Amino acid sequence: MPTVEELYRNYGILADAKDDVGQHKSAYQVILDGVKGGPKEKRLAAQFIPKFFKHFPDLSDAALNAQLDLCEDEDVSIRRQAIKELSQFATGENLPRVADILTQLLQSDDSAEFNLVNNALLSIFKMDAKGTLGGLFSQILQGEDVVRERAIKFLATKMKTLPEDILTKEVDDYIFSESKKVLYDVTGEEFVLFMKILSALKNLQTVSGRQQLVDLVSEQAGLHQTLNPADPDSVDRLLQCMRQAVPLFSKNVHSTKFVTYFCEQVLPILSSLTSPAEGIDVQLEVLKLLAEMSSFCGDMDKLESNLNKLFDKLLEFMPLPPEEVENGDSAANEEPKLQFSYVECLLFSFHQLGRKLPDFLIAKVDAEKLKDFKIRLQYFARGLQVYIRQLRLTLQGKSGDALKTEENKIKVVALKITNNINVLIKDLFHNPPSYKSTVTLSWKPVQKTDSGQKRMSDETSSTSPPKKPVVGPKRDSRQIYNPPSGKYSGNVGAFSYEQRGGFQGGRGRGWGGRGNRSRGRIY
């Protein structure tokens, strides 16, 4: 094993040789042997090996393996030095291998070491983006679970920091094709991260690009399969996929396939869906997704059939008035609860699809059923007016900070919901029914005005929906408000389904059966 002095002497030979450095193979071999020495010798070897690496192609494998030995040394300072210099080996055919190695080194739990690996990956990204991606995707597809997880997060967080000239069309196409391979077997969290990666690609900002992403989500959601309502993973998968699809829809990228699936496969089994997590009102989440998607539904093959399914589900949530006994009192101990959040979603969806078949209630629904529907509408409208008056009374005179308390924020949302329902019911009371009004769903952001707080009224909620839905609010936005009187019940809330970060049990359940990877160095 060479000493420190011998390492310096052979370094001097190579440094002084200048253009003839390649003729001093024995001197470079001495430096390679430095990895077998003590801490001082190893630190010097970690610096000297990469410096002359390119001059000795015959020793390239030996040099790279020597550096890798140092990257795995027990001494953290030696590891850091070796990793810091590793990008110098990323030349020609070696680059994908170096990228693969650096990707494996992402599993380090030492923060300084981890940052060095990130920086090294970014530096070789700028040399050859496609080659670097080859190493990353190799580990994502075949590496250990911890390496896979960190490689995906690297792509999701670091890609956006790269200059535009690096992410060429060829690179974008490569990312898309490799991502599709990965998506055959992903967890929920991984799927969300890949949608983040793909949605940011320049090539996929066009209408055709967005359509490709929608098709990708459609495959992941399993729209060709029958939904098993008893399997929480299947329900979770559907909900997470839909949340990724919603921001992609527009007037040119339609949600028809998804809305059709919801009407045909999900609505009939809505009440039997198993919640994917405690505290999730899965029925409400499904109905909110359907409402958001319905705005972008194109021509539908089975429109009348699906409108019927939607209509029947709406009837389930709109109770008949209680029967009265001779003295005029209600025969029941309590009047039916009015589930405003559900009805807002169902009415909105029905209103959106009804525009495509405006004579549905007149020509496609029999007279008795239509009469029953109008009775339910009238009863709901009466309860609605009572609720709106109560809410306006409690909010009267409040502005600014007073409206920012949790209780008042919930009441404001409740007022949005009831105003929306009021507008939609008025449309359906027209003869013939009208589908002209537009409302902004209660959980969607409203446009700010220069004059400050908007006055809460039917008019304020009757605004055009945004062309592109936004990502749902975070977990803490769940809002439930019970009316003061206790007579009318409202499950009132903004979209509350949080991104759980994975399907139950992670990979190996729900979205595929990836087993644990082998441990140890696989360079």
Curated annotation (Swiss-Prot):
GO molecular function terms attached to this record: fibroblast growth factor binding; RNA binding
Coiled-coil zones: none
Gene Ontology CC, one term: nucleus
UniProt xrefs under InterPro entries: API5, ARM-like, ARM-type_fold
Residue segments, region Disordered: 446-523
Short sequence motif named Nuclear localization signal, residue ranges: 454-475
One Gene Ontology term from the biological process aspect of the record: apoptotic process
Keyword Nucleus: yes
Complexes and interactors: Monomer.
Protein name in UniProt: Apoptosis inhibitor 5-B
Species: Xenopus laevis (African clawed frog)
